[in-house]
Amino acid sequence: MARVYVGNLDPRVTARELEDEFRVFGVLRSVWVARKPPGFAFIDFDDRRDAQDAIRDIDGKNGWRVELSRNASSGRGGRDRYGSSESKCYECGETGHFARECRLRIGSGGLGSGRRRSRSRSRSRSPRYRRSPSYGRRSYSPAGRSPRRRSVSPARARSYSRSPQYNRGRDESPAYDNGYRRSRS
């Protein structure tokens, strides 16, 4: 079986019209025309050679773009349990297995036994990261201490402001009394 993609279709083209156009090249299994969004279709041929003949003759005709569909190597769209026919292992670059199953990774001690892995993981965890009882998330705090809380009075907090406050005049400032600077005593 071979699936052919037909693009740049007029939205008014019907499956029957496409079937009539492509049937002359060979036996069709199915014709599917997209409606939302319109403008493309898929046609399944029984024989790959018939599909290639149709592509050669119809591509460009009526402004259509006709090509072999990318995932048509098998009845399941060319996919297997590894995602797709082109999936490769991240470790060695070979197809047919995942990185966690790669013999290079396992052989070099990358995975090792599950027992050794879990022990080293628990040893490497920093004591500063503690499980928070709420939501099960980690929170950062120095070991042995809870986060420091500051209680700052509103007047004092105002004096630490980085940006100048323009709404306060000289006479209203707590450091000035009758327009003259008070000395701290």
From Swiss-Prot:
Subcellular location: Nucleus
Ranges of Low complexity composition bias in the record: 132-145, 152-163
Residue span(s) of domain RRM: 2-73
Main location: nucleus
Tissue specificity as recorded in UniProt: Expressed in roots, leaves and immature seeds.
Keyword Ion transport: no
Tagged with keyword Zinc-finger: yes
Compositional bias of kind Basic residues: 114-131
A molecular function GO annotation: RNA binding
GO CC term (a single one): nuclear speck
Family under the similarity heading: Belongs to the splicing factor SR family.
PANTHER family assigned to the protein according to its UniProt record, in alphabetical order: SERINE/ARGININE RICH SPLICING FACTOR (PTHR23147)
Official protein name in the record: Serine/arginine-rich splicing factor RSZ21A
Source lineage: Eukaryota, Viridiplantae, Streptophyta, Embryophyta, Tracheophyta
